[in-house]
């Protein structure tokens, strides 16, 4: 097995683990919303999980590249120049899905849970729209809704100074419902963000390795000596 095949196999196993993690993490808030909410249209904690960043972005869109990468370990029909090229091509889909998962997670972390929303816990701010994702402002990404002592939407802070931000930072505990919502929202979407980042790195590396494997070739089966 060449270096390209070994790295491709490692990428396949890594992507498989990340797919499972992304799907499970995304399903946790969905399950809670189905159990606690009277209807499935609103979640008392959040609503960004209904954009399915872990199920679609980090899950379904990474399956083709994962399948092709794992096939390299078996030295089957996929273990040739064409197979390596396809693994590189399918990894582009993985990269797109990982970016989608990251953008949704960043948007969710920017807005905070519904209990921190100033519009009476409305789901309007997280209505599905690619335009909303394109409006992400890195400068407003400060997580004040999580680290501040009180749950206030980041948009309610006007030009906060660094000293004020540091002095008001406080890790929420689970003593109140508000803090539990903040901790749960932060944990879920920070985890999905990390899954998306890792999938992006593995996807980019597989694009490079698959391209090199396509150019340099792969190992052949040794003929059995009878």
UniProtKB/Swiss-Prot annotation:
Feature type site, description Cleavage: 13-14
GO CC terms, sorted: endoplasmic reticulum membrane; focal adhesion; plasma membrane
Annotated localization: Membrane; Endoplasmic reticulum membrane
Domain of life: Eukaryota
Pfam families recorded: L6_membrane
Membrane topology: Multi-pass membrane protein
Residue numbers on the Cytoplasmic membrane side: 36-49, 105-191
Transmembrane segments: 15-35, 50-70, 84-104, 192-212
InterPro entries with a match to the protein in the record: L6_membrane (IPR008661)
One example of a Gene Ontology biological process annotation: negative regulation of proteolysis
Keywords for the protein's UniProt record, in alphabetical order: Endoplasmic reticulum, Membrane, Transmembrane, Transmembrane helix
Stretches assigned to the Lumenal side: 1-14, 71-83, 213-226
PTM field: Glycosylated at Asn-132, Asn-148 and Asn-163 in presence of ceramide which inverts the orientation of TM4SF20 in membranes exposing these residues to the endoplasmic reticulum lumen. Cleaved by signal peptidase at Ser-14 but the peptide does not act as a signal peptide. Cleavage is inhibited by ceramide which inverts the orientation of TM4SF20 in membranes exposing the N-terminus to the cytosol and not to the endoplasmic reticulum lumen.
Domain commentary: The first transmembrane helix plays a critical role for the insertion orientation in the endoplasmic reticulum membrane.
Role description: Polytopic transmembrane protein. Inhibits regulated intramembrane proteolysis (RIP) of CREB3L1, inhibiting its activation and the induction of collagen synthesis. In response to ceramide, which alters TM4SF20 membrane topology, stimulates RIP activation of CREB3L1. Ceramide reverses the direction through which transmembrane helices are translocated into the endoplasmic reticulum membrane during translation of TM4SF20, this mechanism is called 'regulated alternative translocation' (RAT) and regulates the function of the transmembrane protein.
Sequence similarity: Belongs to the L6 tetraspanin family.
UniProt protein name: Transmembrane 4 L6 family member 20
Species of origin: Mus musculus (Mouse)
